[in-house]
Swiss-Prot record:
This is Zinc import ATP-binding protein ZnuC. The keyword Transport applies. It catalyses: Zn(2+)(out) + ATP(in) + H2O(in) = Zn(2+)(in) + ADP(in) + phosphate(in) + H(+)(in). Pfam families: ABC_tran (PF00005). It comes from Ruegeria sp. (strain TM1040). InterPro entries: AAA+_ATPase, ABC_transporter-like_ATP-bd, ABC_transporter-like_CS, Metal_Ion_Import_ABC, P-loop_NTPase. It is found in: Cell inner membrane. Part of the ABC transporter complex ZnuABC involved in zinc import. Responsible for energy coupling to the transport system. The lineage of its organism: Bacteria, Pseudomonadati, Pseudomonadota, Alphaproteobacteria, Rhodobacterales. One of its GO terms (molecular function) is ATP binding. Its EC number is 7.2.2.20. GO terms for biological process: response to zinc ion.
Amino acid sequence: MRLVSLRNATIRHSGTPALENVDFHIDRGEIVTILGPNGSGKSTLLRSIIGALPLSSGTVERAQDLRIGYVPQKLHIDPTLPLTVERFLSLPVRISKTETENALAEAGVPGLRKRQMTGLSGGQMQRVLLARALLSKPDLLILDEATQGLDQPGSAAFYQKIASVRSQIGCAVLMVSHELHVVMAASDRVICLNGHVCCEGAPAQVASAPEYQALFGSGTHGALALYRHEHDHSHDCDHDHAKDEHEHA
């Protein structure tokens, strides 16, 4: 089932295109990662997907009654503000103790209900933000650099939990990430963005694409190529590199 689809999406800021002629889609159960340098339009694309930013031209279609959960990069909370995890999860609509406990357990942090938000570690904070996103029972879970500031083991544990959540509730997951090694292990499909879609496809295919290497350098290819995708996904670069490899084999 297709959850969100953008066609020829263009967004301009003061006349300058931030995104130009972008085609995008995500289906139920998929894990899709968007990669791109700073200023490439990743956050702009996310905002257009959730409906927070209108398109200058093009079309966007969302499944009827689509529920979206969103985990931001970070959340600033005034350190002088007394705010428990339970109260945070109840804003702006109060939820029951059982709902709070279930959401925290689903996110892998049971027992934090009475903790102060300002006393949480980085990893605990991200799990609480995940719990909040899961309260709506989302069809689509969006993670915007959600592991920024976590160490590698913390990031790996967080993404393992995301994979578990996807399996449990059957949602699609859309990630923006700079952690290339995690992308390869976690994604069904990778989209390389730089104001437009440079290339798209299964992770191993994108890693070998010249468009990808022009943005991230060929030195990343060795680490990324450790991943071997088990399924045959389409590859939608300006040039079909998978076809070239077959013809020259």
